[in-house]
Swiss-Prot record:
It comes from Parvibaculum lavamentivorans (strain DS-1 / DSM 13023 / NCIMB 13966). It is a multi-pass membrane protein. GO terms for molecular function: metalloendopeptidase activity; zinc ion binding. This is Protease HtpX homolog. The chain crosses the membrane at residues 7-26, 30-47, 145-165, 170-190. Zn(2+) binds at H130, H134, E199. Keywords: Cell inner membrane, Cell membrane, Hydrolase, Membrane, Metal-binding, Metalloprotease, Protease, Transmembrane, Transmembrane helix, Zinc. The keyword Lyase does not apply.
Amino acid sequence: MNTVKTGMLLAAMTALFMGLGFLIGGPKGAMIAFFIAAAMNLFAYWNSDKMVLRMYKARQVDETTAPNYVGIVRQLAQNAGIPMPATYIIDNPQPNAFATGRDPEHAAVAATTGLIKMLTPEELAGVMAHELSHIKNRDTLIMTVTATIAGAISMLANFALFFGGNRNNAGGLIGTLALAILAPMAAALVQMAISRTREYSADAGGAEISGNPLWLASALQRIDEAARRAPNEAAEANPATAHMFIINPLNGRGRDNLFSTHPATGNRIDALRRIAETMGSRSRPWG
């Protein structure tokens, strides 16, 4: 996402936040919400990556503690022409991964123990290349900031449902209930629509970085099947971060529609196979 789109999204999130503030405290509540949102946006810009990593209890590793995993990421970063990101492992049986950070110079990737144990080196390279594509395209800022703001909107909406103090104005009780319910839904829809488009782009970019689209295609199929059998309790507790992962960690079986955080896995695999056909002899083995 470019800077303009990032700014537009943050403005929309701020407007939702202010609307909920208005429900709770009228014009003064909206003004307070504006300053809170501005501070939150600034805080998220600098710290949301650390928050997400802490949320999932990710531990940083290096080539001494996780040589194969870190070595793969290092080679892929060189292929992509970006700085080596910090590498983390999450102790979770569900195979999954995400990238975070405000720019390529301050980025991190995290993979679960389930992912590292299950995949072949080629499949792991396909997944991590996808995550590095997010970093290279500067998607990671919008991923982490929207997760932070959307979560805050959901919490404030719940507060507005019980403590909304402006119910005699601007539509009364019905207006209060409508905005308190619709605001988090709108925030979620923004996340979902952006996530689906971004995932296709990262799949294509990752195929170029790794050199073989079929590695990621194979990994996605295996991850999708395994993720349905392995719940991710941390993600269930923090659903606003679901769009950050390579596969929906909430075990959803939704199709490629308005309410899905990720494109249908089958559609992604088909797209990768088409890319493989066009790459032809350019596809190369790992290592």
